């Protein structure tokens, strides 16, 4: 400062104050000497006092005056306006810091801080506006201002929002890997929005939670274990993601009411008179919520308007519950809602059908609510599929340094955590199925794909529907359904079922998962009109598959051409017809009232018409089947049968006849696929047979359907089915009548489901002896012709060493062979082989055959014999192939004479009958012998001959038999 003050040079004439001792500046000296000379120059230099700034001079005579600086105002005025170059650089930073933006009320520091409330507002605004930083900043400031106007929140600018956006993304982007085809804004939005949702649901985010962020982005939902609870996190269906997926066009305009008013009116005068005869109003009005099930709605009106006969039937069933059969027609168990007011008795009334009022506009729904509200349809995988990306982000491999997830999480200590963001990689099959929205393609595109499905899928649907009907019968296990291979266009149209969404919210259009009862009725009526002739069967079996394929191909081409001509029609004609036809309990499935309102409802009203379906012929046939007890079959197809198994077989054939005619077409091929049959001769025999052999056709069809398709029961798993011996007996009769000659190998047959209560207790012994099938020693006994004398001993056995007892070729039998198997017939010449062979043996060898019975013969075969069924077969050619007789053990006659048969002993004795009932679970040889010994207690136990006779008459002692056989062979070798 002193240097600045010395800038103007001081004048030299000014004397210093100590050099002027005389103070006579203002007045001259009193003596007047020399005073004037001193005063004159001092007065001339008075204006120089301003050089020291503000100077106050006190001119007192005789005293010394001192100058003191009080203010430096003049000094500031003399300072230049531009500072020196050394001071210009630091001043620029100060000027920048001093600038203020209009939206910033407070001057913040260099680093912006975000509180938890501000972060929540940021993610809420991000879900709303996406990557629009200015709109996000305005939304944050508006929320903070509404929260508390007097708060000390620092309002955010656009740049601060952008900075926070990218900082957050770079922190979490390392946990997610995207496809190269996906654009950067989409990557950022999916990552940040899902992270914000996870941050909102979880209080604290750890490394383990970040590792699940990838699954949340890809699949749209995850389940996180936090504080002992499973928290489910879903991708929010926010506006930003809907706009990114192009799904936000019409969502805001849709407002569905919580309840709708349903107006029901009769469709015809018959329905009008039916309701009016009950003294009720045919026109009704009911207010129901949107989530009300349509099947519950139909059941309510069916119960309200049931006929007088149905009411009497219900009262009778309440009074006499045992006199009425169980429910046979109410097989609709697919609904979740049950009506407590409806009794569980068979309905005598026809089913009630509801349809849209004629003339109402059935339009394509403007939106698919499930697509908007479902997190699955808006996840990243769905977006990539919608955009048609070739490489999906979910299919990419693990990041570098990230191990693959194990099947189960390894148990670690509580303090340790996983450091890898990808230790639990989701399986490809774990991702839920994606739902396509209406914007992806027209609605009819998916429906055409479903309608053009293969015939096998159609056959599966028809099997499921007809299986539900047959399961209500008394013997559902004995009824089988043939597999369909070719169907006509009408049947294909009828059998198509729309896919139903698994999401509980409203669906876009009414969907059906089951076949309509009315639809199947029409199919049955059309197919049962005429029976095909044999020539038609022959030609149809050869040309039907190719014709059906060509028809399906032409239908596909025609549908594609029509779809190309009509640019995105509202609804296809097939869907319109299906909707116009209406819904019953059989095909209502999971449709709700809200589904119908979205399609053809308006102004909170839904107009429906009702009518009663005609009673179909299948119900009458089923009731006739229930009343059949015993029917005498044709002698040429099945021989005489005993017991309740005969009636069961006839019921099987009758039911099969009914439903084969129902499912087969009237002018095309067989009701099964001939390609699935492994025997060409059987197919030829079936195609060339006449109407009299219908039963054999049905048995073959039943066998094929059981072989081709695995039926499932109501409980959802495939039950173990027991072998039906009657089916094999009937197949043998069929082969005998038609002259079919097969190879020398057995054809394994799948068992037919049978109720356990109908199985004879003796037959259950076969399950205990099947472990002896694979024995190396095969014992074969020659059969005694029925014309021989009763006391004649059994023929000689031939022992053969076989590697397999199932598929060993069986030698043909001629007149002089001794190693084959002879079948006994009703004619005398059929026993020539056995008689000639028996004459070649020594008389002494026949004494060991007294200890043998029929059980030894059947031990080498697959199954135990059907002891209570004896089928008489007639064979004229003895030298022919007898593999059918070997294949079916149950067809052999009972060759026991007198008291030699163990079944004779078991049936004649009351104690043994009681043993069968009491020891139904204990079929041991010891218990059987114990009871048989009690029959004749007067025998001498010490007598060996009596013991041997007891064993030979009433038991199966294989060890003793084999010892006798070995002794017999040794004796033969010695001789």
Swiss-Prot record:
Gene Ontology cellular component list: nucleus
Compartment(s) of residence: Nucleus
Entry's family note: Belongs to the cramped family.
Residue ranges, compositional bias (Pro residues): 7-20
Descriptive protein name: Protein cramped
Compositionally biased intervals (Basic and acidic residues): 86-98, 410-425
PROSITE patterns for the chain: SANT (PS51293)
Residues of the SANT domain: 109-173
Function, as annotated: Polycomb group (Pc-G) genes are needed to maintain expression patterns of the homeotic selector genes of the Antennapedia (Antp-C) and Bithorax (Bx-C) complexes, and hence for the maintenance of segmental determination. Can act as a modifier of position effect variegation (PEV).
Gene3D superfamilies given in the database record: Homeodomain-like
Matching CDD domains: SANT (cd00167)
Keywords recorded for this protein, A-Z: Developmental protein, DNA-binding, Nucleus, Transcription, Transcription regulation
Recorded name of the encoding gene: crm
Entry GO MF terms: chromatin binding; DNA binding
The keyword Nuclease belongs to this UniProt entry's keyword annotation: no
Record's compositionally biased regions (Polar residues): 100-111
Protein's UniProt keywords contain ATP-binding: no
Coiled-coil features, chain-numbered ranges: none
GO BP annotation list: segment specification
Bias (Low complexity) ranges: 815-833
Predominant subcellular localization, coarse grouping: nucleus
Region of interest called Disordered, as start-end residue ranges on this chain: 1-37, 71-111, 318-346, 403-450, 809-844
